[in-house]
């Protein structure tokens, strides 16, 4: 299906508000390095290599705004910017939105700074899906048996054919975003797709490759080092 919106702009919010708690590090995880560069720079460079006209907004934890500016400024284009985030993920997203003027036909992508391995072709597919469906997310399937537990014991087994693991970016078309912004938010949503679902809007799914890892723990950082060479072959 051809896009109805031919003059769209693409905006990318990269959420980099981590403090290193789950990583068990005094250094926020987005500043930890693999392959000789901080995670955040790997992610930023990935989006800068995407040959689309876009504006990138880096949303940083307020305590680390100067570090973010120092590390990232050399990799930002003139239209890009760095702003302080909020107290929650959703609050940070709203802060990022405040820096933008989004029209109905535009596309907004929201991405975790700790996911440096998204593929450019996935970004293209995601945008196509957003144009057609309004809201979309990357997600991946599992080949594992999926169970639910209660008090540390198996409670039930879930049908993995209908189980997807949410990834990012998640994205939304401007007209749908404008509608969501007029609605009450109770409870505070954890991400874009849960926000949309509370308003009765379902997100379409674009399958992501299995290495679209969110670096959260020390073991993930070790995996990222290993994945880095492999990822170059997937590009």
From Swiss-Prot:
The keyword Metal-binding does not apply. Pathway: Isoprenoid biosynthesis; isopentenyl diphosphate biosynthesis via DXP pathway; isopentenyl diphosphate from 1-deoxy-D-xylulose 5-phosphate: step 2/6. It holds the Pfam family IspD. One of its GO terms (molecular function) is 2-C-methyl-D-erythritol 4-phosphate cytidylyltransferase activity. It catalyses: 2-C-methyl-D-erythritol 4-phosphate + CTP + H(+) = 4-CDP-2-C-methyl-D-erythritol + diphosphate. GO terms for biological process: isopentenyl diphosphate biosynthetic process, methylerythritol 4-phosphate pathway. The record marks 22, 29 as: Transition state stabilizer. GO terms for cellular component: cytosol. Keywords: Isoprene biosynthesis, Nucleotidyltransferase, Transferase. SUPFAM superfamilies: Nucleotide-diphospho-sugar transferases. The record marks 160, 214 as: Positions MEP for the nucleophilic attack. The keyword Transferase applies. Its EC number is 2.7.7.60. Belongs to the IspD/TarI cytidylyltransferase family. IspD subfamily. Catalyzes the formation of 4-diphosphocytidyl-2-C-methyl-D-erythritol from CTP and 2-C-methyl-D-erythritol 4-phosphate (MEP). PANTHER family: D-RIBITOL-5-PHOSPHATE CYTIDYLYLTRANSFERASE. This is 2-C-methyl-D-erythritol 4-phosphate cytidylyltransferase.
């Amino acid at each position: 299906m051809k896009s109805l919106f031919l003059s769209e702009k693409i905006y990318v919010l990269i959420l980099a508000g981590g403090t290193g708690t789950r990583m068990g590090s005094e250094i926020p995880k987005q500043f930890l390095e693999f392959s000789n560069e901080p995670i955040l720079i790997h992610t930023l460079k990935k989006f800068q290599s995407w040959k689309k006209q876009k504006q990138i907004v880096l949303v940083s934890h307020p305590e680390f705004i100067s570090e973010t500016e120092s590390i990232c400024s050399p990799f930002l284009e003139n239209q890009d910017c760095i702003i302080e985030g909020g107290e929650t993920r959703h609050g940070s997203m709203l802060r990022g939105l405040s820096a933008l003027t989004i029209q109905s036909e535009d596309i907004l992508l929201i991405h975790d700074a700790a996911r440096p391995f998204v593929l450019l072709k996935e970004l293209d597919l995601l945008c196509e899906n957003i144009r057609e469906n309004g809201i979309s997310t990357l997600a991946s399937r599992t080949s594992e048996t999926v169970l639910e537990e209660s008090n540390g014991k198996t409670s039930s087994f879930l049908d993995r054919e209908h189980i997807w693991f949410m990834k990012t970016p998640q994205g939304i078309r401007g007209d749908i975003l404008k509608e969501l912004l007029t609605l009450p938010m109770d409870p505070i949503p954890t991400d874009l797709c849960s926000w949309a679902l509370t308003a009765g809007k379902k997100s379409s799914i674009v399958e992501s490759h299995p290495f679209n890892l969110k670096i959260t723990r020390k073991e993930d950082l070790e995996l990222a080092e290993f994945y880095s060479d492999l990822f170059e072959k997937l590009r």
